[in-house]
Amino acid sequence: MADDPSAADRNVEIWKIKKLIKSLEAARGNGTSMISLIIPPKDQISRVAKMLADEFGTASNIKSRVNRLSVLGAITSVQQRLKLYNKVPPNGLVVYCGTIVTEEGKEKKVNIDFEPFKPINTSLYLCDNKFHTEALTALLSDDSKFGFIVIDGSGALFGTLQGNTREVLHKFTVDLPKKHGRGGQSALRFARLRMEKRHNYVRKVAETAVQLFISGDKVNVAGLVLAGSADFKTELSQSDMFDQRLQSKVLKLVDISYGGENGFNQAIELSTEVLSNVKFIQEKKLIGRYFDEISQDTGKYCFGVEDTLKALEMGAVEILIVYENLDIMRYVLRCNGSEEEKTLYLTPEQEKDKSHFIDKETGQEHELIESMPLLEWFANNYKKFGATLEIVTDKSQEGSQFVKGFGGIGGILRYRVDFQGMEYQGGDDEFFDLDDY
């Protein structure tokens, strides 16, 4: 979905925050002991600490003893969390503390603090019977940044659009000679001069685009829209002077009736549909590439939990592709009376069969050391295997086919791997039932 690893890492961060939002929204507490605190990047820790001290004084007057103690406890937890930071991190700080009531009716303390993956320009402090995640949700909605080049006969404008924020990066005007029938014997010379000036103008636009939209050898926008009233935009998109890296990012050519800032606004309006589908298109492209490896039988692919984990262990996986709602759980069990551990990967159906958790020889239950969704384990560990992780949906035709046909887990490999001819060492420790995929 993303051409460079940093964008893929960002997608994983987004998935983690989506998961966090889901669990925070579901949490409920008694009284108003659940604190949501968001500190924007340029704020001071000392100001927030003073505000919390004032709140502590106010909360001491709460009449209900139970509520008073739980609110004071939550404020103290937040104060302890803030002590871990000398200053507010570059992207701001998000803290959630409080006592929640679990499904079994038990009370459980929650303390979460993290720096979001991009600046959060919201200041928030709320005590309530639920956590407030609206600012985090807003952070996810406007993620990708798009570049715009508005080019016509009178000048060029370069801008970006991220969410609802548009920014003009650079603009310049140009004075190109118009076509005319005068000149007599010099008519050809005039035409040649005009073509030369036009050529130089397109070159200047192409060079400026590289300066603005490529940083550190990588394109810094998710896609480019070329807009204009004449055929300059077409000329630019097909020109050899236009950088190949930018050429591959062009999403759409848009016809507009104005130049400059008005043209920029019109270009944004006319390309909204394309921009909203970018993630969708990237996903189709990624899974399409995966299917190509399979149809050409290159051997540079894997699917299903067992093969994918083998390939990861070998360091062969370049791109690990996992369905966002993959329902496979990863269990680490310790066999009773020994230090030996075994790892199981089970679907909800398989989890119902308790024999997986019982030692066949002794009939005793294994000790559960760790259990978490497999996707979460991948999100925490994929870098150790030298892979990039792409989390996909089933909303596109390709995505749906990937989930139904390949179990929602697979990978594009760096080199050919023969899984059938390979005896997996320690394979007895793992449990897979491939009938379920």
Swiss-Prot record:
In chain numbering, motif NIKS motif lies across 61-64
Report the superkingdom from the record.
Eukaryota
Q: Which UniProt keywords apply?
A: Cytoplasm, Nonsense-mediated mRNA decay, Protein biosynthesis
GO terms (BP aspect): nuclear-transcribed mRNA catabolic process, nonsense-mediated decay; regulation of translational termination
SUPFAM superfamilies in alphabetical order:
L30e-like, N-terminal domain of eukaryotic peptide chain release factor subunit 1, ERF1, Translational machinery components
- Report what the protein is called: Eukaryotic peptide chain release factor subunit 1
Molecular function terms from GO: translation release factor activity; translation termination factor activity
Q: Which GO terms describe its cellular component?
A: cytoplasm
Kindly list any coiled-coil regions of this protein: none
Q: Kindly name one Pfam family recorded for this protein.
A: eRF1_1
- Protein localization: Cytoplasm
